[in-house]
Amino acid sequence: VIIVRYGEIGLKSKATRASFEGRLIRNLRAALGIDDVWRGYGRIYVASSSREDAVKASRVFGVASTSVAVETGAELEEILEKATDYAKQRIKKGDTFAVRARRVGKHSYSSMDIARQLGSRIVEATGARVDLTEPDVEIFVEVRDRNAYIYHEVIKGVGGLPLGTQGRAVALISGGIDSPVAAWMMMRRGVDIVALFLDPSPLVDRRTRDRALQGIARLAGWKHGAIKTYVAPYGDVLIDLLKVKDYRLGCVLCKRAIYRAGKEVAEKEGAKALITGESLGQVASQTMDNLHAIDRVIDYPIFRPLIGHDKEEIISLAKEIGTYEVSITPANCCLGPPPHPETRASPERVEKAEEGLDLENRVRGMVEKAEVLRVEPEE
């Protein structure tokens, strides 16, 4: 059996906890392709003895850790016999070991009784020395009411909240390093995403689109299922934005158009927020003043999970979640800022620059023409 532990879920109210556990069980079934997943108090169990399945389960949002365990009854003698045999198979000559025992429920023995008696039997059976500080092998015994579980490895999980427990948001994906990381961080907090990529063709080649979709496919691997993705034609609108008389506002105008498109998709999909990869001060459009001018274009919440991260931290996380290598393949995600881009745009100045462009209707038309895809996880 695989033991699945969760962290933050255990702090919720009884009703919320039950709801989140149910969602986590459904997500585990989808990720593992195993229907036999059930809950016990404070734990979820999977009918598998595969370490590969335990690793997969550890990559499901909401999971704190997993272990492949041997299940036995809760009688002390049965535990000691099974755990001694288990230890003999895993402790090599010269190894040191420690027994870590814990118990939930009413029993005639304590956790200390298990640790002391099992330790003595393992010493007798293997000749190994006890080292409680830095052992070569740890033998864990977890007694939960009428069952006990014996294991030697704890696989760290991704943590967070079960995907789908916190509603839906539109993730604005550019094809760069930052936006997939931002989307992943919100997925880890339980947010289901719909992706939106604005395709600047013919100003850039096909590689930009391909790179964005590859990044979404990596995110789909974390979802363990397809991500609905809108690919909207942005080239004609972008060309006109680059021609505005107040050319220093180019980056701000571009972002406002992207946000408008995000709002249109959110309304179609019942999403309640947008997700962007902005980091304060990283580029011209991400100064405090410019973000203020950009935000006023829509009335939806905008989640910026990377706002306080520097580039090195973002790159490190991108490598950890597997999106970095696809985000650095050759492509032109952005045509580059205008010479001397404005860093302190006022909302009034930006709105004046947009006059006559009919952006509301043109962006709505872009989204109506969007190609709607189901981006599957990479094999």
Label every PLM stretch briefly.
Residues 322-330:
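A short alpha-helix-loop-beta-strand transition element characteristic
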Residues 176:
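Conserved G/P- and acidic residue-centered "switch" motifs that form tight phosphate/ATP-binding loops
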Residues 171, 195-197, 231, 276, ...:
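Structural beta-sheet core signal
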Residues 56, 333-379:
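Flexible helical/loop "lid" subdomain adjacent to adenine-nucleotide binding pockets
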Residues 216-244, 329-331, 335:
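A conserved beta-strand->alpha-helix junction
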Residues 1-170, 180-228, 296, 344-347, ...:
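RNA-binding accessory domains that recognize and position tRNA/RNA substrates
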Residues 192, 272, 324:
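Residue-level detector of anion-binding/catalytic polar loops
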Residues 117-122, 126, 154-166, 238-239, ...:
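Active-site adenylate/phosphate-handling loop in enzymes that bind or generate adenylated species
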